[in-house]
Amino acid sequence: MRILITGAHGFVGKNLVAALENIQNGCDRTRGTLAVTELMLYDKESDPAALADYCARADFVFHLAGVNRPTDTAEFKVGNTDLTATLLHALEAAGNTCPVVLASSVQATLTGRFTGSAYGESKRAAEVLCFSYAERTGAKALVYRFPNLFGKWCRPNYNSAVATFCHNIANDLPITVSDPAIRLELAYIDDLIEEMIAALSGGEHRLADGFCTVPVTHSVTLGEITDLLYTFAAQPTTLVMPEMAEGSFAKKLYSTYLSYLPARKVAYPLTVNVDARGSFTELIKTANCGQFSVNVSKPGITKGQHWHHSKWELFIVVAGEALIRQRRIDDSEVIEHRVSGKTPTAVAMLPGYTHSIVNLSDTEELVTLMWANECFDKNRPDTFFKEVDPCN
């Protein structure tokens, strides 16, 4: 399939091109029989003469190009309405009735706060052209009225509050929130791209009024957005990873936020607690799913020798050789597991069992990844000394 993308260097365009290139070069093998043979990219820097050639050869058109922040409102018509007319004329002149996706905007409804919007009017006119073209030629028109968009590569301080908030908070810059209660309808860029790829195979989501839609959107307030972003920004300090359900706005916003991090923030130090036996470092904490840590034991060292009422843990040795021993505190039987980083094994530390881990090497350190079902609370540690050896 030969695909023409106008506005290829814009926010949506860059993400769509990246996704289609993955299909084209075989990196994305999840798309069944969908084949991309050529991507014809057209943007404001392109030679206008190339558009006619692309329109003659295209099997599918994504018309994403447009103007949304001009210095002169007259540019809305030129960049949105007139360019659409030029594109459709080139297709019709070539006798090419391939499907055409038009990226319009919710502002084209011209209702509510969008009443009288010059941008919305120019997009509305482009919609009319597209539907008329489809009726006249029999070509398939897929007109999407996109809501506010967010995701990686969106330009900050331009046309997206989310992009600006992410950029500023990631770079320790102030933000301005006029009213935290203002609610936005947002579509995540990856959800939008999934819909675009579905449209390539005839799987678009179409509404009763003839418009197409991105089926997954999120309704959130400015206050909710900024609260989440400040929580994300604090994570390297608190170590607390926020809960992010699959498909949730929080999960998508966190991915977006991370894409704005400056290089100096990509890595951050952890607190290493060192003693004569080795070290212990907390890695990640969660609100309801415990915490992850890494424990380093020096050669020949035994750690642990304690038990818990309700807390339980998983030990996974990732480097070295260890003997993990545990005993129910009211019994004499000792359960032993010899484990190695060469064959990682998860060993559960059971509630009511005192346990220890011994570094069996005389020369090498033992490195153990540990997960506990709850975060450590110094006021209620639920940790009590007792040696595993029942003779002691």
Question: Language-model segments: which ranges?
Answer:
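N-terminal Rossmann NAD(P)H-binding glycine-rich loop of SDR-like oxidoreductase domains
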Residues: M1-G26
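Substrate-positioning beta->alpha
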Residues: P156-T164, A181-S201, L222-D227
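NAD(P)H-binding glycine-rich loop region in Rossmannoid oxidoreductase-like domains
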Residues: K44-T86, A90-A94, Q107-F114
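Conserved beta-loop-beta element that borders a ligand/cofactor-binding pocket
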Residues: V128-P156, H167, L173-D179, F211
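Mid/C-terminal beta-alpha module of Rossmann-like enzyme folds, strongest
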Residues: D191, A198-T271
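Conserved Rossmann-fold NAD(P)-dependent oxidoreductase catalytic core, especially the SDR/UDP-sugar
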Residues: A85-E127, A134-T137, L142-Y144
